[in-house]
Structure formats: C-alpha cells, structure tokens
C-alpha cells in the first residue's frame, strides 16, 4: 500500500513538473518570437515606458511620455560613442554578458554598503539593459534577473550589434517621462539627436544611471566630472 501511494505521488509530482516545464518553454518561445519581431520592427513602446506612464498617471491622469523613434543614422555618432563609453566599453566584443564586470560590481557594492554609502555600480551590459527595458519590469528578483539573462542571449543571437544599440538608444530613459535619444536631445538642448555635439552627448550619457534625478539636478559635481571623463574616453570607443 505504501509503495502504491509513493508511486502515485511520484506520478502526480512528475506530471506537475512536466506541466511547469511545458509552460516555461511556451513562455520562452513567445519571448523569442518577440525578440525576432523587434529585430525587424521598431517598438511603439516598451515595458519600462508602460511602467512609467502608469506611475505618472497615478498623480496626473493626462500625463504623456515624450518619445520619438529615430533610425540609427539619425543619432549622432558622438552619442553612440558616449553611451558605449559610459555603459559598456566592450559592447562590440562580448556576447551579451560580462561576468567579470558583474563580479566587480558586486564586490564594489558590498564594500559601499559596508561603509554606509549609497552609491552603487551596475554590471549590466547594454544588451542586458535593453532586455530589461524592452521586455521586463523594473522590479528586482532572482527570477527576473534570470529571465533578463535568457533574453540577453536571445537578443545577441538574433540581432546585430547595430540593431541592439539602435533599440537601446531609442528606448533608454533620460528623465521624467523622457525616452529615447531624440526626446532627450529636444528636452535638454532643443535640437535633434542628429545635431548633438560631443559635450552634449557626454552629458546625456553621464545621466543614464539615474536619469530622473539628473533631470532635476542638472549641474551636480558628479555629473560634471563624469561628463569630462566620458569626453576623454569616448574618442577611443568602437561603435557598430
């Protein structure tokens, strides 16, 4: 009798696990289909945009995002160089994830936390940030991070580096309700993304880690220092 109950429990457990595996595979297939779609189609919005407009409309039901898609060749090369210099210096060389950078960021953040400092460093590549911004929420969990890694490898497998950077620059957050290079250039400088100069591009790139804060605090010591550093570094950056 006990052996029969054990076999019955194992069958039920096996059935549940198989059903969960099938659901997981169906979900990942759907995500892969979306990655393939965006390899050839420009998104009208993104997960991070939908999250932000919901947040803004909690206090202002009529709130709108500032977002205009522009093709890769209408974004000034200086912004491409500055963003890569700021966010992912090895963008053209890696396969989507830089494990050494993640380990170094983790060690740095642990040290900052031990000293009671709020400054943190991210280890995510441009492709990882794109996966998060385009498909996922801003919440933090091990499950979400795992899905981000899966999407990152999907994106790198399907898309060219140029397409990845084009998507990233067009959906990156650059302030409160400000998304994409074109909207950022017009919001901060009153010009198109095609007409940005090196100094303007470096400052926009320096804002990326905390764009909502720097939208309201546009001349902090850190932002000025980071802009100067990027101006020097961006000349040595390779772009796709």
Curated annotation (Swiss-Prot):
Subcellular compartments: Cell inner membrane
Molecular function terms from GO: pentosyltransferase activity; peptidoglycan glycosyltransferase activity
Reactions that this protein is recorded to catalyse: [GlcNAc-(1->4)-Mur2Ac(oyl-L-Ala-gamma-D-Glu-L-Lys-D-Ala-D-Ala)](n)-di-trans,octa-cis-undecaprenyl diphosphate + beta-D-GlcNAc-(1->4)-Mur2Ac(oyl-L-Ala-gamma-D-Glu-L-Lys-D-Ala-D-Ala)-di-trans,octa-cis-undecaprenyl diphosphate = [GlcNAc-(1->4)-Mur2Ac(oyl-L-Ala-gamma-D-Glu-L-Lys-D-Ala-D-Ala)](n+1)-di-trans,octa-cis-undecaprenyl diphosphate + di-trans,octa-cis-undecaprenyl diphosphate + H(+)
Annotated InterPro entries: Glyco_trans_51, Lysozyme-like_dom_sf, PBP_transglycosylase, Pep_trsgly
Chain segments annotated as coiled-coil in the UniProt record: none
Entry's Gene Ontology BP terms: cell wall organization; peptidoglycan biosynthetic process; regulation of cell shape
Transmembrane segments: 16-36
This enzyme's EC code(s): 2.4.99.28
UniProt topology in membrane: Single-pass membrane protein
Keyword Iron: no
Gene Ontology cellular component list: peptidoglycan-based cell wall; plasma membrane
Principal localisation: membrane
Pathway: Cell wall biogenesis; peptidoglycan biosynthesis
Family recorded in the similarity comment: Belongs to the glycosyltransferase 51 family.
Function: Peptidoglycan polymerase that catalyzes glycan chain elongation from lipid-linked precursors.
UniProt-recorded name of the protein: Biosynthetic peptidoglycan transglycosylase
Organism: Bordetella avium (strain 197N)
């Amino acid at each position: 009798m006990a052996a029969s109950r054990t076999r019955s429990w194992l069958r039920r457990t096996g059935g549940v696990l198989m059903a969960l595996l099938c659901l997981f595979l169906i979900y990942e297939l759907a995500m892969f289909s979306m990655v393939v779609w965006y390899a050839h189609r420009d998104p009208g919005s993104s997960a991070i945009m939908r999250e932000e407009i919901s947040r803004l409309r909690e206090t202002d039901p009529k709130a709108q995002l500032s977002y205009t898609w522009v093709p890769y060749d209408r974004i000034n090369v200086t912004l491409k160089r500055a963003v890569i210099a700021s966010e992912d210096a090895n963008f053209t060389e890696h396969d989507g994830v830089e494990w050494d950078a993640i380990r170094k960021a983790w060690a740095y953040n642990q040290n900052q936390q031990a000293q009671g400092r709020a400054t943190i460093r991210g280890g995510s590549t441009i492709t990882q940030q794109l996966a998060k911004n385009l498909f996922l929420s801003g919440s933090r969990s091990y499950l979400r991070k795992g899905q981000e890694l899966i999407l990152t490898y999907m994106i790198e497998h399907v898309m060219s580096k140029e397409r990845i950077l084009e998507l990233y620059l067009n959906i990156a957050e650059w302030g409160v309700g400000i998304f994409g290079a074109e909207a950022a250039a017009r919001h901060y400088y009153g010009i198109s993304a095609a007409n940005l100069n090196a100094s303007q591009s470096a400052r926009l790139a320096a804002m990326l880690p905390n764009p909502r804060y720097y939208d309201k605090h546009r001349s902090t010591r850190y932002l000025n220092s980071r802009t100067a550093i990027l101006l020097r570094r961006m000349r040595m950056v390779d772009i796709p």
